[in-house]
Swiss-Prot record:
It is an enzyme of class 5 (isomerase). The lineage of its organism: Bacteria, Bacillati, Chloroflexota, Chloroflexia, Chloroflexales. Substrate binds at residues 28, 98, 120-122. SUPFAM superfamilies: RbsD-like. This is D-ribose pyranase. The active site is at residue 20. It is found in: Cytoplasm. Pathway: Carbohydrate metabolism; D-ribose degradation; D-ribose 5-phosphate from beta-D-ribopyranose: step 1/2.
Amino acid sequence: MKKTLLLNSVLSELIASLGHGDMVVIGDAGLPIPPETRRIDLALCRGIPPLLETVRVIASEMQVEKALIATETGQRSPHIRDGLGQLLPNTPFEEVSHEQLKALCRQARAVVRTGEYTPYANVILVAGVVF
């Protein structure tokens, strides 16, 4: 049995297979996921799992070079933006429009769907390198 924080085998495989610059989207329950993009659906019910907890666990194993969030996140859900900043304190953040974020989902290696019910609670984690 794994000793590290992340136990989900699908997420572990995804993170182990990432290359520099690959993107992983962690989204709320309502984020549209393009049919051609891999969907990893963790949503059990409203609020479970929450987005920030999901980011915390994924970031414990993923080298994150930068994070992208929608401008609307800070405007409509500042507690999500602040929480992401606390979880990823040394990670640069870039803001894009919500429409741009949705379009970037097509280029992502996967979209991880959470049970989050907060507007604009989505983040794209861009993989870095550990050397």
